[in-house]
Amino acid sequence: MTVTSTQPTISNQLGELFVSDDVWSATLTKEGSDAISAIDWNGEYLEVTFRRGSNNSDPYVYTAKTSAVEAILNAVRAVLSGASTIVGDATATASVGSVYNQMLKSNQLVLVN
């Protein structure tokens, strides 16, 4: 996952993740029938564009509450640290949690420091 931004910063042992008021960019390491094509931050909500279908042609946009952002990042960190399971966050919408858990468990999101 490549994160492009300015501030504020959430830091951990893997490096720094930047949360901006304009945009995040996310990159998948491999393609699948379902893929996250973009992650945008509008200052209030995390917006995830999730393409479905055999040709990834159908776009769906999901949102998560601001309070869910750190929990989602923690899930990314956990997978990168070798965790085999992800604990869902109650503040995230069910669809966002499901999408992230699926993508993270299959190691399709990779943090680039």
Feature roles, as predicted:
Residues 2-21, 25-113:
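Acidic/histidine-enriched, beta-strand-rich ligand/metal-binding domains
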